[in-house]
Amino acid sequence: MGSLEVPCIDLSENDTSIVVKELLDACKNWGFVSLKNHGIPLDEIDRTFKLADKFFDIPVEEKQKYLFKGGRLHSGYTGHFGEKLDMEHQSRGDLKESYDLAGFPDPKLENLCPFIAEHMDEFLQFQRHCYKLTLRLLDFFAIGFGIPPDFFSKSHSSEEDVLRLLKYSIPEGVERREDDEDAGAHSDYGSITLLFQRDAAGLEIRPPNFVKDMDWIKVNVQPDVVLVNIADMLQFWTSGKLRSTVHRVRIDPGVKTRQTIAYFVTPDPETPLSPLFEEKTGKDIETVTAGEWIDGRINFTYGYSAPPKGYLGSQNDGIVA
């Protein structure tokens, strides 16, 4: 197991050109970057984690009344084994439970958990901070590529974004199998992901420029930073210049739980996905809209459908430059 520090960028730097260069370098070589002075109040992050604690304390039987049932409006509860991220190597789903909230900026959901509804204003406040940071990062990417600053951000209205509460644990009475994963090896579907971590480590990554020498690299937990990773759509969109890195979660032995919050960023559904630059992007992939892509990936991951048109595989081997 390798150990390297993910690059960390200070967003309070006044010279935008420095931030843009460091951000692009990290996302080209690692696909992951840590951000400090990111603008999201630390007390709001802590408050959202406390709300997540209370949600996961709700009895499983009650949470299961609000199960996620497929589709792009990705909202609802998913219990242990409900999501299998590495179809090739896992015999059953991940050792985690989650609750997803989508449909921003004004979620209107038929199957909304009462606890989530009760605290909707707090979740939406946190989501707005995440979205503001997202737009800033997308503009930095565009500036770095010398294209109009709003090239990416204008296609991200937040209506497809997902705020996910996550708790990794082994259910009572369940024995861990040899091929079990807390979260199987995968790359994310959309444009970028913001990850907030607390307490226990467990995230492992395979940066593109290091995998020849190292297998998996452990990522340390830094509560005051936001961890950002590039996802598949943005890798494809930038012709592989930004890299969507394969990652997984494996909690250390003896650690009972790990909690995180993820904010998944996805282009608006009508956005056409085609490579911006001329470099080869791997095997030919039929152009699809962002909506078609995300529908297919979600439904395949949850076992509702066959692999989607243009599916790249769990090891992300189809769109690497």
From Swiss-Prot:
One of its GO terms (biological process) is small molecule biosynthetic process. Keywords: Cytoplasm, Nucleus. This is UPF0676 protein C1494.01. Residues 159-267 form the Fe2OG dioxygenase domain. Disulfide bonds: none annotated. It is found in: Cytoplasm; Nucleus. SUPFAM superfamilies: Clavaminate synthase-like. The keyword Ribosomal protein does not apply. Transmembrane segments: none annotated. Belongs to the UPF0676 family. GO terms for cellular component: cytosol; nucleus. It comes from Schizosaccharomyces pombe (strain 972 / ATCC 24843). The keyword Cytoplasm applies. One of its GO terms (molecular function) is 2-oxoglutarate-dependent dioxygenase activity. Pfam families: 2OG-FeII_Oxy, DIOX_N.
